[in-house]
Amino acid sequence: MDSLLEVERLSKTYIRGTETIHALKQVSFTLEEGGFIAIMGTSGSGKSTLLNILGALDAPTSGTLTLKEKRQRDIFTEPAATLYRQQHIGFIFQSFHLLDDLTVQENIALPLMLKGMDDKTINQEVEIWLKRVGLTKWNNHRPQELSGGQQQRVAIARALISRPPIILADEPTGNLDFKTSAEIMQLLQELNREQQTSILLVTHDATVAAHAKRVLYFHDGQIVADQPSTGDVAPILETYEQFVGAV
């Protein structure tokens, strides 16, 4: 597969009073086109910091990002950061981040509205994605009228409607029960396979990580192991315990 995003020697340091915190230490890896990477690690290991940097929500202290063989030099300041996100990144969060005052279809339409697309095109795309995530009958409902799994499906449709090459998912099943979590992960797998959308997903759950094609293990701001996923949970748990600690 061709390289989509190359992360090279990425570091992030915070200064808090007299304390220096090294959130990321020389992190390097490649996300291929159509790739699906799960990132596992303990709280505070740098997983979410990495996603924030890849989404241009935070800037690295050092290191480089190369997207489609083009080094991204200016994406950490506005307005370049917003443009980068609009063109290349879709976000899925643990807490859904839907707007309560908008209907399901209005929430899904937001990225296209922000791009200034015409109403006809927006309505056509929203209809496609409502059907794809199984929420056509819920199009005029508001988020608070939906279950957690349904709300996450809305968030997934919103993230994908502008067809970004990369999805960044931060604990997307963290607020869901086991059955709903499995359904959401199956949906992400299908979208990764059918749309060839590359996914980088942070999780603490080995069952969730097993849906990815590859697992990176973080500890103390560093990648300590990199393992292809076979879909089995046991090897992931074994590697986690070996390199990170007991689950």
Positions of the model-derived regions?
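C-terminal end-of-chain micro-motif
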Residues: 1, 246-247
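ABC family nucleotide-binding domain
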Residues: 4-5, 10-223
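Conserved beta-strand-loop-alpha-helix hinge in the C-terminal portion
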Residues: 222-246
